[in-house]
Amino acid sequence: MNAILSDQKTFQAIIRVNQAIEDIRQGKMVVMVDDEDRENEGDLVYAASFSTPQKVNFMASHAKGLICVAISKKIANRLQLEPMVKKNDSSYETAFTITVDARTAATGISAGERDMTIKILADGGSHESELVRPGHIFPLIAKEGGALVRIGHTEGSVDLCRLAGQGDSAVICEIMKEDGTMARRPDLDIFCAKHELNIVYISDIVEYRMMNESLIRVIAESTTQFLGKDARRYDFVDHNDNHHIAYAFGNIKNRSAVKFHSIMPDNELLADTKKYNSLIQAIHYLQKSGGVLIFMDNGTQDMSKIREYGIGAQIIKHLGIENIELLSDSKNKEFVGISGFGLSVIKSTNVNETVA
């Protein structure tokens, strides 16, 4: 029965993505929704290559949120769009760049002038000198790998435009209700019916891409010992050539415990008594219950900085785990936006509260 339900869910997801691709290809707008465990919000989305003053005005009048343009890193580099801040500590680390206007614009705020700016961002032959900074359009840089890395509207909208053959820039705007609060699932259904728009979920796009793509590959597999415990070691490389290691302890089942940890030099780990003891505690628990310790090469020693676990989710999926007991060093660990990978967090456990 679960397999049938899963197949039906996948079928519906593919239908929604195919419809959204066709809408984007025709220059229409769609509503894109993220997971309930993330922002749980909907954005109006259309391909920047199809921008018009009328579309910008519709977003400003009916969606009411911040009008942004999601772009690839390649576009940002070509137009010399630097990050808005050096240290991004926003909730979901949304990658805003410095705001921009078209150089030929007057104030830059009208629908027509914002459309001028959007067209420059979408034009593959445009030059950074055509823009002035700051301005009234907010570019956002999508992570390389798209929604398979970060399950956000920025990545989902760029993925959708690419799938539709409309380049890698999308205009997006959050949808708010008349009272100024954010529109949620029931509100978005009403919004779509009123404006005759189709809806697509970012998890749908993840599922659609996962049918034919993977950003990870196994480069080695061996039986070994880790800190004195028998384990199966898996070495992975992702699309950015980052190296990740998974140690599987005990009997790995569909439902298993998972602990994420940053890759760090042995001397640093041993020098940090708190982290070392926490790791030992986690390994005891994983061996007893059956689970996986995943060392992520994420460029930071602070795992709390990882708000999206796209690569980690693919590693978990590769190991045959779908229902996760998430081990962490605190009660506030996030593992969001993973339903498109066919995963569910069924329990969160504080490592420090487990009994070795």
Swiss-Prot record:
The record marks H136, E174 as: Essential for catalytic activity. Pathway: Cofactor biosynthesis; riboflavin biosynthesis; 2-hydroxy-3-oxobutyl phosphate from D-ribulose 5-phosphate: step 1/1. D-ribulose 5-phosphate binds at R38, E39, D43, R150, I151, G152, H153, T154, E174. It catalyses: D-ribulose 5-phosphate = (2S)-2-hydroxy-3-oxobutyl phosphate + formate + H(+). Mg(2+) 2 binds at E39, H153. Mg(2+) 1 binds at E39. Residues 1-211 are annotated as: DHBP synthase. Keywords: Lyase, Magnesium, Manganese, Metal-binding, Riboflavin biosynthesis. Residues 212-356 are annotated as: GTP cyclohydrolase II-like. Catalyzes the conversion of D-ribulose 5-phosphate to formate and 3,4-dihydroxy-2-butanone 4-phosphate. It comes from the Bacteria. Its EC number is 4.1.99.12. It comes from Sulfurospirillum multivorans. GO terms for biological process: riboflavin biosynthetic process. This is 3,4-dihydroxy-2-butanone 4-phosphate synthase.
